[in-house]
Regions:
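Bacterial N-terminal signal peptides
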Residues: 8-17
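Long, contiguous juxta-domain segments that are non-catalytic but functionally important
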Residues: 26-40
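Surface-exposed patches in mature extracellular/periplasmic domains of secreted proteins
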Residues: 84-96, 148-154, 172-180, 231-237, ...
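Acidic/His/Gly-enriched intrinsically disordered linker/tail segments
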Residues: 152-221, 227-228, 234, 243-248
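Beta/coil-rich, acidic/histidine-enriched accessory regions frequently appended to metallopeptidases
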Residues: 2, 6, 247-323
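Boundary at the C-terminal end of the N-terminal hydrophobic targeting segment
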Residues: 17-25
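Soluble non-cytosolic domains of exported or imported proteins
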Residues: 64-76, 127-132, 151, 155, ...
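Juxtacatalytic substrate-recognition/specificity segment
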Residues: 43-149, 153
Length: 323
């Protein structure tokens, strides 16, 4: 999530000064904006990964896991993003971990206005299993690889993060291809336009923002690979944007982002697809696409048909590119 206005609010329970003081301290690290000044007063640990530096700090509070386990989780996530983009998308990023009740990652928000930053609300009872299963950190780190866009184009930012996150984790060896293709078959229909919907720019619902944006990415990935003989895909387009200086610390119009991505692949796929999906609702035949990609989901596990016409494209999408 980017610069979310919603955040976990920890209630102040009137149990005396001992309870009120920690609550006040905790509130300094929550809210709509990233607490840059408060962060910079905290002791931070540096993690070097993907040519970048992660500055990791913890808001007051305790975790069942040692802090080095949480730091290792961040490093693993950053490595996955670095594999996908060829490097980590920004030179440095502040990462603030705020303890919350319960277990698991409760929320993540990325920021870029005063330097790349990510705030994570993490359950204080989290286990290593919770961290291994988490997708939020890779999602938020992926946001750092795209310039900030005006609100009507939020679907592009959330769609890229939704689409890239599982692929990056497959390329890093943290997920299986069968897992993520099964998830796509299950979830991608959430992005289809409903009755009365407009294009992606004009339908800011949850499904259209996240899964409509992810559907744009999938269609673009497949079409780029068709037009380039499977020599390039969306991954090369997104790497091109990062190499051109595009990241969340910048604010770019969507046309510039798409043009740079298209230039990186030698196609016009992103601009053409935006012309088709930006203003008007577009509903591709997903069932036909899954068949062509050779993805079948029945009662049991996902199966692949490697004789399907687009099976080489399916395999290439999750393969680590050379170089």
């Amino acid at each position: 999530m980017i610069k979310s206005v919603a955040w976990l609010v920890l209630p102040v329970v009137l149990l005396g000064a001992a309870a009120v003081a920690p609550a006040r301290a905790q509130s300094e690290y929550t809210g709509q904006r990233f607490p840059y000044q408060a962060f910079d007063r905290l002791p931070a640990t540096q993690i070097k990964v993907g040519g970048a530096t992660l500055e990791v700090a913890f808001a007051p509070g305790e975790f069942a896991l040692p802090r080095n386990a949480l730091q290792a989780w961040l490093e693993t996530s950053a490595k996955a993003v670095s594999v996908y983009y060829g490097r980590f998308p920004v030179a440095s990023v502040r990462v603030l971990i705020v303890p919350a009740p319960g277990s698991g990652v409760k929320k993540g928000t990325s920021f870029g206005t005063r330097g790349a930053a990510i705030r994570l609300s993490v359950g204080s009872d989290s286990t290593e299993v919770n961290l291994v299963r988490d997708w939020v950190v890779v999602h938020e780190m992926t946001h750092l690889a795209l310039p900030d866009v005006p609100d009507p184009h939020l679907w592009l930012a959330e769609g890229i993060a939704t689409y890239v996150e599982p692929i990056a984790r497959v390329q890093a060896g943290d997920l299986t291809a069968a897992k993520i293709w099964g998830d796509m078959v299950r979830d991608m229909p959430k992005g289809l336009p409903e009755q009365g919907d407009r294009g992606l720019d004009g339908t800011p619902t949850w499904g259209r923002t996240y899964w409509g944006g992810a559907m744009f990415c999938l269609l673009a990935d497949v079409e780029i690979r068709k037009q380039t003989g499977n020599k390039a895909g969306l991954q090369q387009a997104l790497r091109g944007i990062v190499e051109a200086g595009g990241n969340m610390e910048q604010v770019w119009p969507i046309e510039r982002i798409l043009k740079i991505g298209d230039d990186a692949t030698g196609t016009n796929v992103l601009a053409d697809l935006y012309a088709k999906m930006g203003e008007e609702p577009y509903a591709p035949d997903l069932d036909a696409l899954w068949r062509d990609l050779g993805v079948s989901v029945g009662e049991g596990p996902v199966t692949f048909d490697d004789s399907a016409p687009l099976a080489p494209i399916r395999r290439a999408i999750t393969a680590v590119p050379a170089g």
